[in-house]
Amino acid sequence: MEQYYAMKAKHPDAILLYRVGDFYETFATDAIQTSNVLGIVLTKRNNGGNDIELAGFPYHSLDAYLPKLVRAGFRVAICEQLEKPSKGKKVVKRGITDVITPGVTTDDKLLDHRKNNFLAAVNFSPQVIGISFVDISTGEFYVSEGSEQYINKLLQSFRPSEIVIKKSSKALFEKCFGESYYTYCLEDWIFTDEFTREKLLKHFKVLNLKGFGVEDLIVSQVAAGSILYYLETTENHNPTHISQISKIASEEYVWMDRFTIRNLELIDSLHPEGSSLIQILDQCKTPMGSRLLRRWMILPLLKINKIQERLNAVDSLVTQSELLDDLRDRLHLFGDMERLVSKIPLLRISPREVLHIKNNLLKLKPIKEILAKHSDPLLQYLASKINGCEALEEQISKQIKDDAPNQIIKSGVIQDGFSKELDELRYIVTNGKDLLLDIQKEEALKTGITNLKIGFNSVFGYFLEVTNKYKNQGLIPDHWVRKQTMSTGERYITDELKKLETKILGAEERIIQLEEEIFNQLIQFMQDYVLPLQQNAHALAELDCITSFAHTAQKNNYTKPNFNDNHVIHIKSARHPVIEKQLPVGESYIPNDIYLDNDAYQILMITGPNMSGKSAILRQTALICLMAQIGSFIPAESAELSIIDRIFTRVGASDNISSGESTFMVEMNETASILNNLSDRSIVLMDEIGRGTSTYDGISIAWSIAEFLHEQTHQKAKTLFATHYHELNELALQYNGIKNFHVSTQEINNKVIFLRKLVAGGSEHSFGIHVAEMAGMPSSIVNRANEILHDLESSRASGKMADSNSENMIPKPNLQIKLAEALPEQERKVYEEIRNMDINTLSPIECMMKIAEWRKKLNL
């Protein structure tokens, strides 16, 4: 066990899979955890008088069990036998060959082929927070730095599987970003400027980082260098496929905070059976295309020339259906080229995967020719990035058999004719008996010993056997060596026979050894082609995204948006891209027109019944703007759009009870984040703001927020404001930039029909009781609610809502305890003041001042 403990000491926080013959064994705590996760038998063995827990599984079951351990949140270190056991050696040489963690793996069975598997590192400084992301399975490497809010947004966007932090920052990290992330702590000395910068310079073989555009990002450089150090500790010592480091430049992409990404359901639906936007738009044929599309979606473009470049490419393919279908059929054949290439420098690529690379290179040529002939500039550019790597394709064809096995430990990988020694060994394995017979015949002919035979024993191997009849006739050549005398004759060996014996007995083992040597030479040859192979994968991924957009546009009847410089958003017959795909067969989505600008139509105050479609109208407007700025066509008849630089949403309830925050507190936090980050190119979605508190508090807050948004001089954000507070319709009478709209309904025989059409003017009813009835509320409750509503509306119409003589305005159940009688004197005074007040005569600000006065009286 001494060797085991030495290996375990290298990675004490990982489960150590210790290779013993044909099994991987785990011991002590590792065994208990492994047994629990995998459901395998836990036993004990005697270890010097002490029992130690033991659990293991056959080596060929690693592919099945390893993913379960990693997905359960464990780091796993694999300790392999580095030599074959021999009789004279008690302890076999072993070494740790791989350390797999949630954020560090190239194992296809552990990876979601349509998602990146990012490892992140976060570095705190007094001014900013630095962050770095790397996906070792693809070679992508990013850095950025900024405020806590910005880093939180990046974490929500990139969704790292694991985050590396320094030990002393653990509490701060959890305070800022919560405890839901899988984190790993490194010693503080690693997160230092000098150490991490040296790591980066050494890795990229440069004198400075100016060429990557990250020279001035000192805080995020520390995070990036720490990631490289961490990769080394996981036995990834040569990740040369991480060939560049890129800055996530906030000034190049639309700002969306984590609330917006969640509320717009870009990646995940808020409902278990719902769909997200990525599920609609991702029609990619390759895994690398799907991963790139996700990145485009969370990082929409700001530069109009790049947006138009993508849109024009999509447009050129939408009108050429035959070409589009041909390209998509060809892309489907490539598989995950990006992740295949990443295995080359890590020396973890199999013979069959090398063949896949060769076959992909052969498929590139027709795609390059098609794109080069196309008139679109972006498609021509992608053609120029494709490299056929003919020398590599030729070398693989020379060396690797077309039916090569998946593992190098099995023979049959290297082509016949490539290695003379290998061909001889294969001939020996196939024709060993015939070769022995040839020697027997040749020696019998030379010596005249006609009954000469070749035999074999375990003591001295192959031998020539001469009977007594010939042993004293002087026929035995001098170069024969006598090894054994028997009663029937004598046994001899020759140099030729021993050489053949060595070849025959060691041929199969030598074949595997030689094939491995030749294969490793090929992998070294392939190192020089990693960069062009990566460029091929990136070009194919971008082409895949463009063709996916074109295919989706054709299938879903999307149109190309146009952009203007006058801050106008004018969308005709806009549809929600997700909801329209979820409607029952035969039911059509009701489209709506939207017009927004920074002047007369800055804020649309949208009222209407519950379930009428207000929220859908808000979301579809933002989604259409986002889709356009990632280069996609949009679900509308036409659209004139201005560039949006920030998208904010305050929609839906999102309690954070676990951290002690109520719905209303979360709502106010999200709203405050919006109001503090506005610009004149922002679009803001406010859905039912203020509903988490009392009615008049809610109205007051919503009113004040609408006023604030309208009165901004230089940050006049375009706003869609959905509300059930019909009192807010009065804002349109006071402010030129606010316009009232409502989602229309039709009431027939006391039944509400939702027409889902946005029309000018405010609405006076929410039809909440009708919705309750539709939800299956007991009829007694529905009837009672209608009675109360009727009395409330009658009282309000007659101005008696706050009249102290209207106690019996609503019929009350018997035995009700009068509130005033149960209150202390001070509370009773406030109560009477509230009862006698006509709130309809107060402005929102006066209401808020009155509330503050009451809170002071009540010592709240």
Locate each region found by the language model.
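Short hinge/gating elements
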Residues: 44-55, 205-214, 267, 277-281, ...
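ATPase nucleotide-binding head domains, primarily ABC-like/P-loop NTPase cores
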Residues: 28-31, 217, 285, 290, ...
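Amphipathic heptad-repeat alpha-helical coiled-coil/stalk segments that mediate oligomerization
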Residues: 191-199, 255, 266-268, 359-434, ...
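Charged catalytic and DNA/RNA-contacting regions of genome-maintenance
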Residues: 1-316, 325, 329-332, 336-345, ...
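C-terminal tails and terminal domains of large nucleic-acid-associated
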Residues: 827-860
